[in-house]
Amino acid sequence: GGGGDPERTAKRLSSPLGKILRLDVSKSCGKKRYCVPSVNQYRTSKSKTKRLVFASGVRNPWRISVDSATGNLWVADVGQDAYEEVNVVSTGARGVNFGWSCKEGNAGFNSSQCAGLAGYVAPVTTLCHTEAVSGCTPPFVGESIIGGDVYRGRTAPTLGDRCRGQPPK
């Protein structure tokens, strides 16, 4: 989609843009080479795309990882002009909306796209762009976030908390 989501695809559930889609490729259902998981919020929708929507309101998710210990889904989402964000979909959550393009990070972005922001979940952390945000200082500075796997090993335990460098709880 275009910069700033001018066609509002991130909140339109019939569009795959601005979404995290979930499908089960370990089996086939009918003529499809995949199945729609029974836990998908919109699995009974008439819209083929909407059935697959697991989360909405993302701008450009740039790596997704499942935490093997909790089942939570960690999402690094590249922002538009001012913020990068790390989002988490908790195990069992349904219909999660991360707010794009009403919000960028925790800040407002386009207030005309805030109506009907059901299921909004704020990022667990944000990184600001130094040239775009007044007072933006390390350690939470970045230009294009890239996620990675959730690490829970013993060799480097401080890698267990991917946001703050603290050992996992």
Summary of predicted features, one role per range:
Residues G1-K169:
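Beta-propeller domain segments
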